[in-house]
Amino acid sequence: MTSARNAESSLDPGVMRAVRYHDFGGPPRLDRIARPEPTGDGAVIRVVATGLCRSDWHGWQGHDPDIRVLPHVPGHEFAGVVHAVGREVRRVRIGNRVVVPFVCGCGTCSWCRSGNAQVCPAQWQPGFNGPGSFAEFVAIPRADFNAVSLPTEIAFDVGASLGCRFATAYRGIVDVGAVQPGEFVAVFGCGGIGLAAVMIATSCGARVVAVDVSREALALARASGAEFAINAEADNVDEAIRGVVPTGVDVSVDAFGSAATSGAAVRSLRVQGRHVQIGLLPPAKIGDHATIPMHTVIGREIRVLGSHGMAAGAFPRMLADIESGTLDPGRFISRRITLDEAPAALMAMSDGSAPGVTIILPGAEVG
């Protein structure tokens, strides 16, 4: 007797294609490996679409201590169809369209019970704590708690852009930063998270200042609602922002993650402003160097706020905003590639990220 229920069991060869790296920083490659099986409370998802994110690059470079077993399958933003479920699963059904947050909570601790699974001490992250979604199938734990129903009105590629970047920006702007109508918001870094932050802040009624070194990224930010665009390579950012808002902005968001962007973001704030740090600053990358000018934080009584994903239970509000047309994350998708093309795309991130969001389609044919 099998311990799991699955679709197409008679046709299941038990093998799948997956991108793996065998050494940190070494060339990732497309391998054929065993297809995962669900745990008792888990599910296996057939990956229809998965996002390529800078966090995947950090993991590949060895910046994430949770990746302890090599070879490793990266990928943490995905949407797909439930292929198999464990014996204990009651809510999730085979064939369901789902999206999964990149932080999967335990579902029982005080943080999960209070709606804050994104900081669950026993959290599990696909692509970091275990095999990820750069594959034809991915397994997740505690499916009833972590799998979110994806409305049929939202395409899979759009759904794949939500689990990390868009959801993180949504919570960072709406809940953590508590952006209000009429406030000035400066967004540093207009990649996937930054562009989402621009769009979401604009939808909240804020006036957005976008900062990036790429003209193309700034053009996308303008198209997403930014009222002002500052080229950090050509302009003195501090002076340029004060030229827009002499007293400083109300909220700053570092969506990139570097000593330069986090410092500039804090300096851009008014007295008693709010800084939201979303971009990663891993110790393996920056060492012990201070990234926040604490004298400015103290002197201006600035609030420094971290934002780490969004719990599955909070997704319906964001999905409703997408269904209603208030938010349109699909406009950020700039490239769709096959699983065969994913290794080269991951390596190319060492030379910088292309503007917009890249989506990998594991079921797509080459060419």
Provide a role label for each language-model segment.
Residues P36-T50, H63-S110, P151-E153:
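Glycine-rich beta-strand-centered segment in the early N-terminal region that forms part
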Residues E77, N96-R97, W111, F137, ...:
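Residue-level marker of beta-strand positions
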Residues T2-M16, A34, G263-V266, A311-G367:
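C-terminal hydrophobic helical "lid"/dimerization subdomain
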Residues A259-S324, L361-G367:
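Glycine-rich phosphate-binding loop and adjacent beta-alpha segment
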Residues C106-F188:
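NAD(P)H dinucleotide-binding glycine-rich loop of Rossmann-like/cofactor-binding domains
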Residues A240-S252:
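A short acidic, Gly/Pro-enriched loop at the edge of an enzyme's catalytic core
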Residues R97-V98, I154-A234, E239, I298:
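Mid-domain Rossmann-like dinucleotide-binding core that forms the NAD(H)/NADP(H) cofactor-binding site
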